[in-house]
Regions:
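Extended repeat-based interaction scaffolds and adjacent low-complexity, acidic/S/T/P-biased segments
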Residues: 1-249
Length: 249
């Protein structure tokens, strides 16, 4: 107990809770009951992790993804095991993060999503908050991309709730120069990794409509005939011969 109470690392406490919950499930299956020390230690670890949440606002870029994933896990623990954990204390800590304008962007997006999922923010207000945050970050694409990553860890469905969000994301990307775009690309890719194939398809349709292009052209899935392939190969061969003639290659 003293070791758990003295632990000051958020990630370690979240991993401990996960291990204790796994152990509790195994005991329940094997013995039909759970040793009382397990929920006691889990509560101590949860309490310690919740106390640390407001301090996560200064999380570094190197730590933010791991911290946010553990924060998502802690949220899951709080909702799935309400008889064990103080859900209100957790949500209160989340609100403290949102009330601090200097919070880490990814963590802020995640906490905003948690508050929405718990019904503490109406969908219209939630979408307005997202759009406003992204609009204010158009000149800081890295910050916007990090925010999107945190947001989509829990509330990716909001992308389909209000077309303004997709439009602002598009403006953030369009505003970035090539070097900046390559910098934010890993975050943008990661943000969409949790989307289901059907959601990706739906998103593709929305983007195609927004840019007024066909979905096939957008995704690169245009059907090409054998004749067109043969003609392209012929032209490629001619181009290669011309380059040799001109001693360019």
């Amino acid at each position: 107990r003293l070791v758990v109470e003295s632990e000051g690392n958020f990630t370690s406490l979240c991993k401990l809770i996960n291990s204790l919950l796994y152990l509790a499930n195994m005991q329940q299956l094997m013995d039909g009951e759970i040793h009382p020390v397990i929920p006691e230690l889990a509560r101590l670890a949860f309490k310690g992790a919740v106390v640390l949440i407001p301090l996560l606002k200064s999380t570094t870029e190197e730590e933010e993804q791991e911290i946010c994933e553990q924060m998502r896990n802690l949220y899951s623990f709080a909702m799935d095991e309400k008889q064990w954990f103080d859900t209100e204390a957790f949500l209160s800590a989340v609100e403290k993060v949102l009330n601090d304008s200097f919070s880490n962007s990814r963590l802020f997006g995640l906490c905003l999503a948690i508050q929405y999922k718990e019904g503490r923010t109406e969908q219209t207000a939630f979408c307005q908050q997202i759009a406003a945050y992204l609009e204010s970050s158009i000149t800081h694409p890295e910050q916007a991309a990090s925010f999107i990553c945190g947001l989509f860890l829990i509330a990716r469905d909001v992308l389909f709730a209000d077309p303004r969000i997709l439009e602002v994301i598009d403006r953030v990307i369009a505003n970035a120069d090539q070097e900046t775009f390559l910098t934010i690309l890993p975050n943008l890719r990661y943000a969409f990794t949790g989307f289901l194939p059907a959601e990706i398809s739906r998103l593709g349709q929305q983007v195609a409509e927004y840019h007024q292009v066909s979905e096939a052209r957008l995704t690169g899935s245009i059907t090409v005939s054998q004749q067109e392939i043969a003609e392209a190969m012929r032209l490629d061969t001619l181009a290669a011969e011309a380059l040799k003639t001109w001693r360019i290659v």
